[in-house]
Amino acid sequence: MECKRARAYSSSANLGSGFDILSMAHTAFFDTVEICVETKNSENIVIESNSKIPLEPNRNSATYPLVRIMEERGIKASLRVKVIKGIPEGLGLGSSGASATAAVMAFSSLFNLNLSKEDLVRYAMYGEIASSGSPHPDNVAASVFGGVVSVVSVNPVKVVEIPLNYSFNILLFVPLNVHIEEKTKKAREMVPKTVKLSDYINNSRYISSLLIGFVKGERDLIRLGLNDEIVEKARLPLFPYYPKIKEIAIKYDAVGSCVSGAGPSILVLTDKMTDENKIAEEGTKTCNEFNVECEVIKAKIAGGVEVERRN
Ligand SMILES: Nc1ncnc2c1ncn2[C@@H]1O[C@H](COP(=O)(O)OP(=O)(O)O)[C@@H](O)[C@H]1O
Ligand SMILES: N[C@@H](CCOP(=O)(O)O)C(=O)O
């Protein structure tokens, strides 16, 4: 029985005002997906996992993309799909997107499809439909490409890798005792259907500032760019500790801070001027004030999805 295994890293999407556009892959966690072909004479998908994720193929973000690829390309096979979760689910770390990305990469390798990175994103987006009901491209784009990415088009998929000319590290406040059923789906329902022009203009200024800050290596532009007047504010009930953690991050000279994806994790970018220990100490105290136990994870920018070489 032939098998292929791929690894995809966690991600923090949105990055302030880049809702459904920007995302950053990081080394905090990773998912691994192994796909084995049992036979090509029948069609079936059996899922195994170390975590409590749906085991129905159309409801699992790793396997729904495979269903769609096989339909689209007329591939007939019975698969055994092992989803080894390293990324905690439902915490704003791109867990569903990473599973989808690793699965599509492993499948592409197994069937010699040589899918382009854009095609990997296109198919992995089906995984986000399984997990949140919406094909948001940002998490999967970061898990596919690595680094910081901007999804400039979804039909067709076009992803731009953002050159990073500022060296930073990553702190993530991960609230491990928080569980929100179908979190991203619920968070997306909280996004307003209409926005004030002034908020739109400010958010456009922020996203411009963030991208220019990354490219030109300007710390103050990155800090300014990690703000959002619309989506984070609408979702604040999901992470009420966020404003104070952001205040603490700036107090101890972080580069900047924003919500990680749809939350409830919080992302802090740091550099040599930052007192990371004080941020971690006072930030976890803030979580506790809201009856939340935050674990502080240190990470760096991660690379893109990879097929694991089997020894
Ligand atoms: N392979 C998978 N990995 C993680 N979550 C999955 C997977 N398949 C389905 N899900 C479901 O998707 C939801 C987690 O995805 P989501 O809400 O987007 O949060 P996040 O991407 O921040 O982990 C959970 O309800 C989980 O049961
Ligand atoms: N743009 C999406 C990103 C969701 O990221 P996740 O890691 O929380 O799944 C959104 O904000 O809905």
UniProtKB/Swiss-Prot annotation:
GO molecular function, one term: ATP binding
UniProt superkingdom: Archaea
Enzyme class name: transferase
Reaction equation(s) it catalyzes: L-homoserine + ATP = O-phospho-L-homoserine + ADP + H(+)
A cellular component term, taken from the record's GO annotations: cytoplasm
Residues noted as binding ATP in the record, renumbered to the chain: P88, E89, G90, L91, G92, L93, G94, S95, S96, G97, A98
Main function: Catalyzes the ATP-dependent phosphorylation of L-homoserine to L-homoserine phosphate.
Name recorded for this polypeptide: Homoserine kinase
Annotated organism of origin: Saccharolobus islandicus (strain L.S.2.15 / Lassen #1) (Sulfolobus islandicus)
Lineage of the organism: Archaea, Thermoproteota, Thermoprotei, Sulfolobales, Sulfolobaceae
Gene: thrB
